[in-house]
Each structure stands twice: as C-alpha cells, then as structure tokens.
Curated annotation (Swiss-Prot):
Chain residues that bind substrate: T159, K179
Record field: compositional bias (Low complexity): 935-946
Known EC number: 1.14.11.27
Name of the featured protein: JmjC domain-containing histone demethylation protein 1
Note accompanying the cofactor annotation: Binds 1 Fe(2+) ion per subunit.
Gene this chain is encoded by: jhdm-1
Keywords: Chromatin regulator, Dioxygenase, Iron, Metal-binding, Nucleus, Oxidoreductase, Transcription, Transcription regulation
Lineage, top ranks: Eukaryota, Metazoa, Ecdysozoa, Nematoda, Chromadorea
Stretches with biased composition (Acidic residues): 610-634
Residue ranges occupied by any JmjC domain in the UniProt entry: 93-265
Sites where the protein binds Fe cation: H162, D164, H233
Region (Disordered): 598-748, 789-1056
Domain remark from Swiss-Prot or TrEMBL: The JmjC domain mediates the demethylation activity.
Purpose of the protein: Histone demethylase that specifically demethylates 'Lys-36' of histone H3, thereby playing a central role in histone code. Has a role in regulating lifespan.
Main location: nucleus
Amino acid sequence: MDPEALNLEFYDKNGLDNPIHFRCDPKRIGMTLPSPDFSVDDVLELVGGNRMIEVVQVQNQGSVKMSLQEFINFYKTPQEKREVLYNVLSLEFSQTPLEDLVKSPELVRQIDWVGNQWPDALRQRWISFNGRDKKFYNPHHTFPKVQNYCLMSVANCYTDFHIDFSGTSVWYHVLKGRKVFWLIPPTETNFFIYQEFIKTVNDNAFFGKSVEKCHVAILEPGDTMLIPSGWIHAVYTPDDSLVFGGNFLHSQSCKTQLRVYQVENKLNITRKFRLPYNEELIFYVIADYVKQWTGREYVRPLRIEDAKYDYVGDKWKTAGGHHKKIEYSDYETGVELTNDMIKGDEESTKDEVKVIAMHAENSLFGYPMVSKATFSADTGLEEEADEDEVKYQETKEEMDARRDAEIDELANSNSLIFYKNRTHDFVRNKCVPDHKLPIGHEPPIYFNDDEISRISPRLLDELETLGTYIRRKARVEVAEGICQPASLINTFQTVLKKRRSELTGKKFEFNQIMPRRYTRSTMETGEYDFQPTQEVPQESARRSTRFKVDNFPDELLESEVTDKPIILPQQPSSGPLEYLPAPKDEIKEDINGFEEEFEEEYEGIGQRDDQEEEEYDAEEPEDQEEEEEDEYQAEEYTPTPVTRRSSSRRSGAKNDESEEVSVKKDKKEKMEKVEKDEKRRNSKSKKDKISKEKKKKERERIELESQLDAELRAAHGGGSSKSKKKKPEKPAFVGGLPTSSIQIDPVVSNPYNYDPRMEMMKLGTGQLKSAYRKTKNNVELHIEKNLYKIEPKRGSEEGSQSREQSMEPEHSTPVFTTFDDINEANNDHYDGQKPPTKRAKYEAISVDTYETPSSSRNKEHKEYRPSPNAAPTPSPSHHQKPKLSSPAMVSSTNEYQLRKHMSSERRSSDAGSAMKKGVYMPAMSRQDKMIAEGASAPSSRHSSISSERRPSFIPDFNSSRNSSIDTPYTPTTVTPSRSSWLPNTSSINRHSIEDDSPIDVVNDSLSPINIASSPTYPTAITPPPVTLSDLKKDMSNGRKSHSQHHDDGHKHKIPSKEAIAELKLLVGKLKAINDS
C-alpha cells in the first residue's frame, strides 16, 4: 500500500487485520529513526551500561539477567567465539535520551490506548539498586510501558512461535541486519492448535507445519512492518541485527485482544509475561469514550503531587528529566519502599535497596505553592521555597481537605461530574465486583450525536464486545480515580445500544432507572429523587400548595401547612415518574373528609417512623420494587402531627372555617398526648440506661478483682483460682463402685530424684527422656575411681588411636540359635536391637555376678542363654552347614551355674538390680565390673549363644598361625560366633569396636580339638591352644587388641589361676559390703 495512505481514514475503514510491510523511507509513515551509522555502542551510551536487562538464552528459550554493558561486550565478540547465544527482546528505552531519536509511526501514536488514555499523573516509577556498590539499577513502572523497545540479536538467534502479550499489535523496523518472520493468521482453528502446542513443552516440531497457512516475510535493513493483534509468529536472525519496535493496543481489535487475554488465562501465563494493568487501561478507555459521547466525567483529575512514586510524565520529559543518568548517589537519601508498598506491581527479583527519586525537577510542574513538608512526608521530594515569594504554606492535610471540598462542590453543582474525592478510590491491584452493583436514579444522559455518528459498524462491534466482557466478568481491577464503575459501564452500553438502533433503523427506547416507586410516606418526608416545581405562597391565601394541581392526580395528598421547607436535590430528573396512588376503597374518610385516625396507633409511632427512615435511606434495586410496593400497601396508614386530606381540585373552596377550628383542637389534644408518651418513654429509657451502667460497672469490678487475684497467685506461685463456695466431698463412682481419687501432684517433694519406674524399665532402652534419668549428678556417688585402674582414661591419645585402628565393617547376625532362642525371639516383649545411647563417663557395676561381660554396643540388649536340655537348632539359612559357637571352654559346673541363673525374662538394669536387693550401688569403672563378673565364671570364655544379635567374627584364612601344634589350623566350617573380648590371634580378626576389656585371661592347659571329627552341631568347640608366647608374637607383629589403652599398646597378661583368685577376693569384698 502507499505509505501516505496509512492514516486514520484508512484505519477507521479497514482496521489493522493483516500485516503491512513497508520498504520505503520511514519518514513517509511518520517515523523518526537515527542514522544508519547508529550502533549498539550508541545504545549503551544513551541508555546506560548499569541498566539491568533480561536476556533470552536461545538454546533453551530461558532468561538470564545481566547488565547492558555485559551484553554489549558479548554482542561485540566474534561469532566463532560465542559459546552461547543471547537475544535482547525486552529493553524498553522510554524515559531515556534514546526516546528522542526513535518514534513509532504516526498512526500508531494516534490510536495507542496507553499513550492517549492513560492519565499523565499516573505515569510513575520506582528504582531498585543492586550489586555490592549499588552500581546496577532496574526501573519499575506503574503503567503499561511497552511502547518502545530496542531489540539486539546476534546471528542464528531464533524466537519460537508466540503471540505478543494480551494480543498487542507490533510495529517493527530493522535498522541493521536481517529478520525472517513466519506469520500465522489468528483463526479459531489456529488458536486451538496453538494452545495445544504451548502445553507440550517437549515438542520440538516446527509449529508452522501444523497449520493450514504459514506466511514468510523477510525484512531487510530499513524495512518496517506492522503485525496485527493475535498473529502467531516466529523470528529468525541470520545476521547480527539492531531493531526498534513496540507494542500497542487499539479499539479496532478488541475482539482479538480479549480472546488472547482469555487464552493467557487458560494457559496460566505468569504476570511477568503479560501486559501489566490491562483491566485498568480498559476502564480508562471506556471512560474516555463516555466523555466524548455524553460529556460525563468518571475519572477524577489526578494531581502530580499525589504521586506515590517518582512522576515521569509529559511535564517531566519537557523539563528534561529523561536526560539525567540514574546513579545511586542521587537516590541514597531516598525513601526505602517496603514490600507492602510495591506488592502486586511488576514482579522482580529481591533487590537490596528500593527507593523513590529525590530530585525536585522530577515532580511538581506548575504547583509552586505546595510546601516542602508535603514532599518529605508524601513523595520524599525536596524543594527550597523562597521566603519572599511564599509567606504561608498549607500543610498536607489542609491541602487534601481543600481539594476534596472542591471536588464535592463541583460534583454537587454539575450533573455531568460522576467522580468523587480521593476517599472513594479503590485499592490498587484489588479485584472488586463493584461494576455489578445496581444503579440508582441518575440525571438524564445527554447524547452528543456528532460524536456518536462517527462510530462505524466495525468499531461498534468491537466496542460492544469490550463492554460485554467487562460486564460479565465477576471481579475486575478498577482503575484509580474511577468511583462509579457500574454507572460508567451502563452509560457506555446505553450509547452503543442507541448507535445500534440508529444503524438498524429501529426506535431507541431508553428507560431511566428509578431507585423505587413513590408512596405517601415519600411525599410526606420530602425524600424526592426529582425536583418538582414550586410556587411562592401568597399571604392572603388560606392554604399554600407546593405543587401545581394539574401535574398530579386527584388521589395524591397535599399538605395543609408547610412547617419546614423541604430540601430538594439539585439534579433534574429524566424519564416519566411512576406513582402508585392508593385506591379509594382503602382510604376511609370521616364526615369531615379526613382519614380516620385511631389513638392506639400512637403507641408505636416512634418505631414505625424509625422503620420508614431505615427503609428509605438505603436504595433498593429494581427487582425489589414490586415487593416494596406490597409492603407499603399492607401497612396501615399512620397519620403524622400535620394532617393531610385527599386532594381535589375544588376541595379547598368548599370547607368552612369551623372545620379548621375543630381540626386545630384535635391537633392540640393529640400533640399533648404524643408529648406525654415521649416523656414517659424518655424516663423509662433513662432508668434502663442507669441500670445498664450499674451492671457494667459491677462487671468491670469483678473482672478487675479476678485479674488481681490471678496476678497475685502467679506472683506467689499459686495454682489456679478456686471457687469460694466449698462443695461437699462425695465419693467418686465408676461402674457402681467407689474409687479413690487419682492424685496428680506428688504428696511431698522429691529432692533425691528418686523414681520407682527405674525398677521397671532399664534406662537407655528407648524410653522417653525425663527429669529422673540417671546421670552422674543425681544418682552416682563419686568414689575413688582409681581403684584397680590398669588403663588410661577414655579419650586419651593412645585410646583414640586404638579405636581408630579397630574400625571395621558392620557385624553379621549370629550363625545359629537354639530352640529357646527362637521362642524368646517370638515373645511380645522382645524389643529387638536398639541404637546405642550416649556412653556415660563412668559405668555402674552390676551385682549380678553371673552376668557375662559384653561389649558396650550390646549392653542395652536382652541376652538369652540356651537351655541345657535342648539341642541347638540350626538357623534356617544355614541348615546344611555346621555351626560353631564361641570358642570357649564350658565345664559342666559352669553350665549348671548358668542354667541356674538364666531365664527368658528381660533383665533389669544394673541400678535396678541393686535396688531390688536393697543396696545402693555406686558407679564403678568398667574393669571393676568385669573383675566382679569374672569371679562367677572360672572359664571366662564361655559361649554367649543367645537371641541377641551379636557380631560374628570371620577368621583370617590368608594369615599363618604360629602355634605349638605342628598341623596348622584350617577352619572348614562357618565362622564361629565368639565373644568380642577374647584375645587376638593370627587366625581370627577382631571386629568389635566398643569393647574395652582390660584383662585377657588365657588358659594355658587347652588341648587341640579335631574339628573334622567333631559333631555336626557341637555345643562348644575350642580352637587349638594358644600360649602366652604365641600372643607375644602376635602382638609384636603389629596386631594390637582394640581394647588396649596403655602407653606401649600391650596388655599385662597374668595366668588364669592368679586372675581367678583375685576375682574371688573382690567378690567376697562385695558380698561383705552388701551384707553390711
């Protein structure tokens, strides 16, 4: 098309339905662009390198934030050195010096909603700084700022198929490089396919092959293209390019814009990728059209000094505010914004500092009388005022009150003003259903026929869709300054109906909305929604009338005496008034022509008057008019002190003066009765009030006393408050039997922390923590700890070294169990293996001399012994392999002692055993405990076969064994389960980590055992004899026992006879102590 033909006439006739490609001088379509020598370095200089921008990563279509300086450095790198591809699509350069060099086509500026309908005073922004030195900044705006974009793309960048946010149209000019566009029309089928394409994230297919038609357009340097609303397009960049463009909304594409907006809602597109303040913009557009068509103003003129953030409107640009660079030093003393102040605005990352601009030139253009206090308190702006110029300055409150009073006065005097003061504003970013509220009585609509006649059929269809969408929406975000959205939408749709009737040749019927129908009570109180004509009363006339008789029907009542002037509203009415005169049959009159009155009705006159006031104060919707009418007719008529009579055009001339005298007498009598009733009611109300006050004071006194009592009890450590009335104690009955009361608190204090539950549960076996837990501070007596001390303290350097050397993998399960073991494992009280608790610094000694020493890891486990009569039963998993018990010598005497003391019950703790015997046992060291236990078992290497999960030890098959036997020992069976405190040998590895046995008792009189000739399931099998010399050789080879804690790493080994004698001596001493 001809470039000069792109004007408003073409737009009104054809709209913007198809893409338009211009290959001509940009000035022919009203554009302003820089010279072809303009480069990205100029963009960097005009916009600023410290501006943070969002960059698209082409590989995954994700986004990355970086400064403009960083991207320019990437853009200038050679193509072969670019590891990733970055594409800048969201650099909005409005309010920067670059805006003076680039201007969109003239038609775009004329039809753009944001540029023409958005109020100038609401063009605001706030700046956020981030970085260590607050070097980088990011602007945030409170209006849809999408008019000017600078797009910088490197070669091979690709943007997949998409629709611009909220169905905005696009203007596009290529200054450098080339662009390839794939364009798909916005048909219903294509929209449906596109929605499915967006949902399939992993679909890498080319969307252009999924639709019927896909157009291709190649833009060379200097070309300009207009992309209409809703067109699905993809862009490829073959060369490094520099492009200028922008988005805009207009009236000829309302249908498509709303359809795209609904698609975004269905796809749950985030707020970040949508047009901000879309619904607020629609309200401003509708209000602008209504003002052109009817003269009604629904948007309150907003002031620049009321700006919550930094004003950046037209006056700010005229003053050159956009040429000043943004630096943190200029904003350092600004007002920091809270999250509540910016809640709901443009989403951004959490920045370190958020401030408002502090420059005086950024605000207050044409308002020199505003005080400095206003800036510091409201907007944070500072300005010095000349004393000679201004002597008195208003405060913020005074200025706001004066402004509100001016708006209220203007709204009352002008019937075309529908906005109100700032107290009626809606909360920003809050959806409200106020556009669906019922509309009360309004003044008539004055139509501007010249402007309405310019609405073309095409534009009418688009605007009707816009009005229907807003009306049907449940909740909307009402723009700031609009106080009556329901009336605004109703007027907008009324004008469109009028224009539709004109185009179709039908008669336009406009029904004015009435709040309610008028009844007698309305006429008596004077609550009119219209202004009736008035007549000046003449002094010689006996009666003054307020209305012309010809204007009202005969049934309407007139007042005889005008006591008070009726205040009427200032706005004229429109449309026919509807009256509901009462039928003559329902109005009963006496001989004088007055309605009958009854004295008993005066008793409830005050209540009925209050009800009538409440009913007429609130406006009722249209659909309740009939119900109200029935209610008013059903009520009995209640006369007022001023008498009324039925009107007639000749009724006043026929009455005599005698009638008036009788009426006056009746009036006086009734008034006196009314006054008496009022006095009686007043006196009664005073008495009620006095009684209520007394009750209230008494209640407050009781509450105060209860609070004081509670505070005193809390201060003195008392319990809850008790009732003063003592109830007789009665026995408690449960199931017909009296029971003793359950005592919650202890009778006496427990200074020794004695807990009888210790006798029932062994500490450390999984019970809950309590204040009675056994610790060294509350139950242990600190006796001499160095008794029989033959090892250093735990935690020493050598001890920690030995433990580190003994760290080995997790132990396996026991190789076999006995029949008794299986039975015990199936018992209900079997708890299984518990995690080890924290080891105390000092261990308590047990008085059970028959207890087998075990490692501290298994100290808390239940131990079981095999029955002497039951044969050992093999494990199910090892039924074909011979089972070996721990290699220990078990004599018949020892076995008898073990069988005598063993049971399947859970054994109590060491402290619990001592308590059962009535003896308090102090804490003793581990070696004392083992010495005491060793006395009851001469052969300490007995078998510890039990259902307890003890570790099994695997002999070392690769090592050689130095023994007194010529034939080497070679095990042929499963690894035997042996005690962890046995001495170390060359054929058996040590696996226990927690055992720290101080003494190894070695039996030198052992004889070798032939394992091959042993029974299949032996009770006890011992390895070849081990001598002290063999042990010394083993220790010299570096295999140290993990339980050695002295300096040289070797244990002092003594013969078994001496050890047993020593143990017996200790046991005797312990028995003596117990007996004493």
